[in-house]
Amino acid sequence: MKAFFNPVNRENLDFFFPKTENRIGNNIQIYEKDFPNLEGVKIAIIGVEEERNAADNLGCGQAPDAIRKQFYRLFAQNNMPAIADLGNIKIGKTANDTYFALSEVAAQLIERGIVIIILGGSQDLTYANYLAYQQLGRTINITGIDQKFDIGDEHADIKSDSYINKIILSNPNVLFNYSNVGYQSYLVDTEEIKLMEKLLFDAHRIGIVKRDLVECEPVIRGADLVSVDMNAVRFSYAPGCNNVGPNGFSGEEICTLTNYAGANDRLSSFGIYEYNPQLDIMNQSAMLISQMLWYFIQGVSLRNNDLPDIAKGNFYKYFVSILDTYQIVFYQSKTSHLWWMEIPINENNKEKISRNYIIPCSEKDYLTACNEEIPERWMQTYKKLIP
């Protein structure tokens, strides 16, 4: 694996953080001369300086080290999981070569049960991240925190604003569901909205999400891979992005969403993309990203394998009948109080899609069912599972 990486520059490293204090940079393994020992590592940080397929955002390839300068300065958390910064992926002769390197590294780390953090770079790197799961033969859910869907034209070359189509059309296809959190209607073609509906993908508009952020927690809890486009954050909080606008998530909101991602027992990949240091003002965007990482890591530290398993006796199980037509089974954790619901499927298919027939939900979904209404989240998944 070492052959895929360039070490973190030692000269810059001395500037990153004070050496005498309890900073994150003093409490993690960093690839300087010797490649980190991955035994016992919970989180691996991967920088990728690839920007050749960025959509009007050249300069975002400089992001990884700019983020490190701010991230390493933050104070370490109590009970912080073991972290290794593996350095930056060596840029290939072509962008596809970089995709290959990233997918190979990601596949090896995921197979070892190590959560990966990708510091882009342009967001088309999400496609390379997806290829790692394809290589492993794992069906996954992807959640994109983004102001757009990034679907693009099926005949167009891959770009950071058109990579989802490449994932949808990949063969073999291991994508079960794609969810968007934070799209802005005036930036999205109505035809793309119709396509999302046709494909039974989830789309959550920025205004609805901001009104009740907690309702998007189950969306993120159901993801294996979360990809964050920094253009989803409004300009006043993250000016260092070429396509950012006046509306979007606040700093507090995006940190909450990344904390949800970290706490998700299912999630194995997390990436932050499209930050451009050349456009940043007083390192404000880099500081916000470093805090997003801090909250993500805090979420990982709080994981406790909180998944429905009635045999262990750690969940309540509720049966809700709706108009004598449907019976929906809900699960509530006795420790976290989070909710899940079960989708009835053919017993022969349960093993194939076992990670998807019990899906995360909210208490609001349970209360909706108690009022004899079918939760939209339940129906959406039911349509995907029952042809």
PLM feature segments, named:
Residues 2-45, 51-272, 276-387:
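Conserved alpha-helical scaffold segments that buttress catalytic/binding sites
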